[in-house]
From Swiss-Prot:
Lineage: Eukaryota, Viridiplantae, Streptophyta, Embryophyta, Tracheophyta
Residues covered by region (Disordered): 28-57
Keyword Ribosomal protein: yes
Source species, domain of life: Eukaryota
PANTHER family to which the protein is assigned, alphabetical: 60S RIBOSOMAL PROTEIN L36A/L44
Species: Gossypium hirsutum (Upland cotton)
Protein name: Large ribosomal subunit protein eL42
GO aspect biological process, one term: translation
Homology family: Belongs to the eukaryotic ribosomal protein eL42 family.
Amino acid sequence: MVNVPKTKKTYCKSKECRKHTLHKVTQYKKGKDSLAAQGKRRYDRKQSGYGGQTKPVFHKKAKTTKKIVLRLQCQGCKHVSQHPIKRCKHFEIGGDKKGKGTSLF
């Protein structure tokens, strides 16, 4: 279980700041796929009509987790940077802090 605080003081690379400032931490989420992308248009055109599935469907999935990407937004200039961390099955932002010699459960 990885627990990350909601704010982090780290270096901001934007031209306005260029110093250590407080950043708001959120988790990166994949955006919605565009229907106008060239590959999607080509795929839809190929799929239309008779003939079933025209391209191979991938089944040999190897990974059980994804790498967590933190989205850091500077509270001074609103500049956003991304910071990948290790793979984990359980991830939370701003959860209860674990004290010394105690368990969360």
